[in-house]
Amino acid sequence: MPREKPHINVVFIGHVDHGKSTTVGRLKYDLGLIPESELEKIREEAKKYGKEEFVFAYLMDRQKEERARGVTIDIAHTELETPHNYITIVDAPGHKDFVKNMITGASQADAAVLVVAADDGVQEQTQEHAVLARTFGINQIIVYINKMDKVNYDQKRFEEVKNQVLKLLKMIGYKDENIIAVIPGASFHGDNVVKKSDKMPWYNGPTLYEALDMLKPPQLPVDLPLRIPIQSALSIKGIGTVLTGRVETGKLKPGDKIIVLPSKKPNGAIGEVKSIEMHHKPLEEALPGDNIGFSVRGIEKGDVMRGDVAGHLDNPPTVAEEIVALIHVIYHPSAITVGYAPVLHVHTAHVPVRFEELRGKVNPATGQVIEENPQALRPGEAAVVKLKPLKPVVIEPFDKIPQLGRFAIRDMGRTVAIGIARQVTPKQIEIKK
């Protein structure tokens, strides 16, 4: 059987109004992913106003309006296919959403398309988004220098902006091999989106669509320690206890000895895997990305709850006593100060957490500490902080197990901040092997 094409999640990033949604919309349009009936309606509308050449702009506006009214023609979640890849465009345009979804999005992005307007060049959010992409471990970047029509498709201006962007990407730690392509284009007119533009004969690199085809699928983190955040614990007649969850890292086989932490048992729930199923079919080995149910001997349904994490007994998950984290503040009605106690969301867990120390404000564009021990943190600021979970929770250092090192902080029904765990002080747990 031919192997299915790899799935790659791509996030579109860049400064507000540099054309992220137009670029995604144009990609859909040129690939025939926008229903003809939708186009027809808009053509009629455009004719009425004598602006037939603006059909595409109308299309985008129409979708924006429909989004505002809550209709589901959402550019945000686009699926498309290239000769080698299935691409899911994970993210909606919009700064706040982007920042939030980098962390809480159902799927972590594997690659990013950085959209930069040729007339404006690198702006504040260009920089901030690029830093966030780097922080969250995105290591493939396509740069699309948009609005070349605004600078008369001038090669000199393209080279200037290209150099600005490359300088920024190198400064924050990207290397040449992380940068797939730097493409001049004008997504409004479809230049170098899917079709090669005839307005820039001086450019002979890939189009955006071709660059998406060049992306490599992420390596499955099979060599990392086993971690399965638990979604549910069931008791099934004739089988016994069944745990369900998505394998984030490592691999699981029948016969493996596992421990589930923090669990209702003070020293963790220990058991042996009897069998594994995915989509009602038995599995000999579960790998990262697999959503599985596995039956265990020695663990009762009541020992385990959603938010606990299963690992191998000889390499147990880390239950955190304290966490030193790098956070980006997204929203707060006033400011975050020491003593603030919102809710930490990580993998399938959410627990109350307290801000113990604000160690230093960080420049979100460079990662440099700009103020030691600040009094308060406001939206738009980044900082290194010390957090204390007020209930037991598993979280891992981002540089060791990134899948369990990203988190969001929520309060009042909103995402207050997102972050990564830099250091985790483990709770002392006596594990009886």
Swiss-Prot record:
Pfam families (alphabetical): GTP-eEF1A_C, GTP_EFTU, GTP_EFTU_D2
Binding site residues for Mg(2+): S21
Region (G5): 186-188
Enzyme class: hydrolase
Keyword line: Cytoplasm, Elongation factor, GTP-binding, Hydrolase, Magnesium, Metal-binding, Nucleotide-binding, Protein biosynthesis
Region of interest (G1), residue spans: 14-21
Subcellular location(s) of the protein: Cytoplasm
Reactions it catalyzes: GTP + H2O = GDP + phosphate + H(+)
Gene3D superfamilies named in the record: P-loop containing nucleotide triphosphate hydrolases, Translation factors
Region of interest: G2: 70-74
Keyword flag S-adenosyl-L-methionine: no
InterPro entries according to UniProt: EFTu-like_2 (IPR004161), G_TR_CS (IPR031157), GTP-eEF1A_C (IPR054696), P-loop_NTPase (IPR027417), Small_GTP-bd (IPR005225), T_Tr_GTP-bd_dom (IPR000795), TRAFAC_GTPase_members (IPR050100), Transl_B-barrel_sf (IPR009000)
Protein name stated in the entry: Elongation factor 1-alpha
